[in-house]
């Protein structure tokens, strides 16, 4: 088997945090403090933020409060301002951040997330030698990697983190089809309003999800065009894995009919039946 070091020592940045944010000055500060205050080595972490250019309060709080905090820690960081794209184009923020990232691994973070694990960055490093989608544990208890952690190589192969708005579902379904999801002992608390009662704000209220209408809206995550595209993207990554000698039997057998249920291993990680409503469409 050919080996490829996905955490090369010559790269001073191991992990790039990709963080789109809107309208949440205090939660933005909190999400970064819980992340970086519990990091073993913040100097090897890069924070990349995406702001809407009309989000003046959020930008001001970042400049006045968060930026000095990052400077004091010695953390690499950068921020990109966008003409507002909106939640339905969330992936475009992330794809642009990923394009400019320095890290060997990418970590999609949220401005309503709270890190609960000390030395979480070392846990990622300890699991970053091979090509996996790393799945942290969350209060969702969901089979998806709600906060995807993936090698930069993924973006090099596919050209993006996700072509669809629902980034966690996209990367998770591709990874489950390849049987390359690896759960790591990192706990993240997602303080989303419908989960915890926190952050009932305009950002949450304007959160439109392109799912649950696959027969009606061609933008829907489970529309046949997107399902076909996920297969195509999975094939690209499978070809890369084949080239380095990784086992892709699970995916290949599913495509030829030898494996009748490509989602069987994902379902085992779904004790609360979170995906039950999409069983016929995933």
What do these predicted regions represent?
Residues 94-105:
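Active-site nucleotide-sugar/metal-binding loop of Leloir-type enzymes
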Residues 43-56, 80-84:
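Short beta-strand/loop segment that forms part of the nucleotide-sugar
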Residues 49-66, 114:
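A conserved acidic beta->alpha catalytic loop
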Residues 33-44:
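Short, acidic, metal-binding catalytic loop of nucleotide-sugar glycosyltransferases
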Residues 113-114, 118-152, 162:
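Conserved donor NDP-sugar-binding/catalytic core segment of glycosyltransferases
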Residues 14-16, 46:
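Cell-envelope/extracellular polymer assembly enzymes that use nucleotide-activated donors
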Residues 169-282:
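C-terminal catalytic/acceptor-binding lobe
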Residues 103-114:
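Short beta-strand-to-loop acidic/aromatic patch adjacent to the donor-nucleotide binding site
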């Amino acid at each position: 088997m050919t080996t490829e070091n996905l955490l090369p020592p010559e790269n001073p940045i191991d992990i790039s945090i990709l963080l789109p944010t809107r309208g949440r000055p205090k939660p933005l500060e909190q999400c970064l403090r819980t992340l970086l205050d519990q990091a073993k080595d913040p100097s090897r972490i890069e924070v990349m933020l995406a702001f809407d250019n009309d989000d003046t309060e959020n930008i001001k709080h970042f400049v006045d409060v968060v930026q000095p905090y990052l400077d004091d820690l010695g953390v690499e960081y950068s921020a990109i301002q966008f003409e507002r794209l909106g939640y339905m184009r969330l992936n475009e923020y992330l794809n642009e951040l990923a394009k400019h990232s320095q890290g060997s691994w990418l970590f999609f973070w949220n401005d309503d997330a709270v890190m609960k694990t000390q030395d979480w960055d070392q846990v990622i490093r300890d699991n970053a030698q091979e090509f996996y989608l790393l799945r942290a544990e969350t209060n969702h208890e969901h089979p998806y990697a709600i906060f995807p952690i993936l090698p930069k190589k993924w973006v090099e192969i596919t050209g993006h983190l996700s072509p669809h708005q629902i980034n966690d579902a996209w990367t998770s379904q591709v990874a489950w089809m390849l049987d390359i999801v690896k759960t790591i002992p990192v706990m993240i608390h997602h303080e989303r309003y419908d989960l915890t009662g926190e952050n009932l704000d305009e950002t949450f209220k304007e959160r439109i999800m392109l799912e649950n209408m696959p027969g009606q809206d061609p933008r829907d995550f489970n529309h046949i065009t997107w399902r076909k595209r996920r297969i195509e993207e999975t094939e690209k990554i499978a070809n890369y894995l084949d080239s380095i000698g990784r086992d892709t039997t699970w995916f290949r057998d599913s495509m030829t009919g030898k494996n009748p249920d490509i989602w069987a291993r994902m379902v085992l990680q779904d004790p609360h039946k979170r995906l039950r409503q999409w069983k016929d469409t995933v």
